[in-house]
């Protein structure tokens, strides 16, 4: 089954060492020595993010210390903006994962959890069996190889919307935070500056239009998935019209969200 989200521990997973013991300045994260293994792993994760995989944090840590590293360490490849959601606290990690799934509105079975601790991996496997928990080798130099060997993130074609997905979840978090400043939803929606652009018989996004026909939710009245070639055939046909909508607001671009044949 294809997975949507990688949930990441921090200490000895995204960097070497433990912040609570080594301090934010004492962790291993550099382009030389042991720290280079974590740089390589972060780069592979960033590549996943840029292909549309959601990244989230699940760490038992003091949030102030952890965020100091993420925000200020010059060797961090992954920035705060790359994480769609965070749970940096002292709660059990299985509970954190359930909260992350709820916040992101995705299924537990679409998540993969990376943690260097065998104890944490065992706990999550038992308490949240829907989540995939790969064995992470003791040697950090093998982290990247382990990630790239997983079969869960393969895709037939990567669309612009796929590439944007990680950012879409980040901007959605910003919207939710902004909504708290409004007394009613109507005023909040007005503040978004929503703009919908409708395109007719445009062949520049056939991969995405075909992708939308594969959706299995209640908003798909077609129920017959189309290939990109079939979509293009409809666009070029004299007997059909193809319309699609792209939505933006002040926080960002939702991408192509609807198609009608």
Predicted feature descriptions by range:
Residues 1-169, 173-261:
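Catalytic cores of nucleotide-enabled group-transfer and carboxylate-activating enzymes in metabolic
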């Amino acid at each position: 089954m294809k997975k949507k989200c990688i949930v990441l521990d921090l200490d000895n997973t995204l960097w070497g060492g433990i912040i609570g013991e080594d301090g934010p300045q004492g962790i291993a994260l550099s382009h030389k020595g042991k720290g280079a293994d974590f740089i390589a792993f972060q780069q592979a994760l960033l590549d996943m993010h840029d292909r549309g995989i959601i990244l989230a944090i699940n760490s038992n840590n003091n949030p102030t210390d952890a965020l100091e590293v993420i925000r200020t360490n010059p060797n961090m490849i992954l920035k705060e903006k790359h994480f769609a959601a965070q749970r940096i606290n002292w709660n059990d990690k299985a509970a954190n994962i359930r909260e992350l799934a709820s916040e992101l509105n995705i299924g537990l079975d679409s998540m993969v959890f990376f943690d260097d601790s065998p104890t944490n991996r065992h706990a999550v496997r038992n308490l949240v069996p829907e989540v995939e928990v790969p064995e992470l080798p003791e040697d950090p130099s093998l982290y990247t190889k382990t990630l790239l060997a997983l079969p869960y993130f393969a895709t037939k074609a990567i669309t612009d919307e796929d590439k944007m997905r990680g950012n879409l979840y980040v901007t959605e978090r910003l919207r939710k935070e902004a909504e708290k400043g409004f007394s009613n939803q109507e005023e909040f929606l007005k503040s978004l500056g929503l703009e919908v652009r409708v395109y007719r018989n445009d062949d520049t996004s056939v991969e995405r239009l075909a992708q939308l026909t594969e959706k299995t939710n209640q908003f798909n009245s077609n129920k017959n998935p189309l290939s990109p070639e079939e979509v293009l055939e409809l666009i070029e046909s004299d007997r059909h019209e193809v319309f699609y909508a792209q939505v933006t607001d002040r926080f960002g671009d939702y991408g192509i969200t609807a198609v009608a044949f």
